[in-house]
Regions:
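Active-site acidic carboxylates
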Residues: 1-91, 154, 160-168, 172
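Histidine-anchored nucleotide/phosphate-binding helix
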Residues: 30-38, 129-139
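Short, well-ordered secondary-structure micro-motifs
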Residues: 53-55, 102-104, 130-131, 157-158
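Short, surface-exposed amphipathic charged segments that create phosphate/polyanion-binding patches used
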Residues: 106-110, 159-164
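Internal catalytic-core helix/loop-beta-alpha segment
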Residues: 69-126
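Active-site-proximal beta-strand/loop segments in catalytic clefts of secreted hydrolases
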Residues: 44-47, 95, 122, 149-150
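A short glycine-rich beta-strand->turn/loop micro-motif centered on a GG-aromatic cluster
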Residues: 118-123, 141-156
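Secondary-structure boundary/capping motif
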Residues: 23, 101, 127-128, 154-155
Length: 174
């Protein structure tokens, strides 16, 4: 059975940059310790343009981050440098919290229903939960797990609340 890990937005700006946190750095270490155990790893990258502050998200979160082709946009080296044994590696750019690529990927990925899709990353309460729920919608019978210690939220309370939402939608929190 193949092992699939979806790593949400583990980018410099979210780990050590403008929106970084100690919790994100801990999550990064936890992911790095296990990333080579997976056959397939899919990284997502939050991707914004120079007009970010003019977008709806920019108005609610007026902190420029993950601007395409900047150092902050790049996936953290602690993970990129550890994927040497991963057979299938993908990077998906997204311009909002979640991506509907899971719809086409879920049709195209040769994943049987016995395969577990595991998800982790930042921010638990924004992009991780969004992508987990989109994945659940496209794969209603798939076993999906979220690694709680491989995630970081905007706060401890928000992280915990997002984990509860995922559990209520039959995403196992491990």
């Amino acid at each position: 059975m193949q092992k699939i890990l979806i790593v949400i937005d583990m980018q410099n700006d979210f780990v050590t940059g403008s929106l970084g946190s100690e919790a994100a750095q801990v999550a990064a270490k936890n992911i790095a310790a296990h990333i080579n155990e997976y056959d397939t790893v899919i990284f997502t990258r939050d991707t914004h343009g120079p007009d970010y502050l003019d977008t709806l998200e920019g108005k609610f979160l007026p902190v420029p981050h993950c601007i395409k082709d900047t150092e902050g946009w790049e996936i953290i080296p602690e993970l990129v440098n550890r994927v040497s044994k991963v057979k299938n590696l993908y990077v998906v750019d997204k311009d909002t919290f979640g991506t509907f690529i899971w719809g086409s990927m879920s049709v195209n990925m040769s994943v049987d229903e016995d395969t577990t899709i595991e998800i982790c990353g930042v921010c638990t309460d924004i992009c991780v939960v969004s992508n987990a729920l989109i994945m659940r919608a496209f794969r209603p019978n798939q076993k999906i797990e979220c690694h709680k210690d491989w995630c970081a939220g905007t706060s401890i309370a928000a992280h915990e609340a997002a984990l509860k939402v995922m559990e209520s939608c039959q995403i196992e929190v491990i």
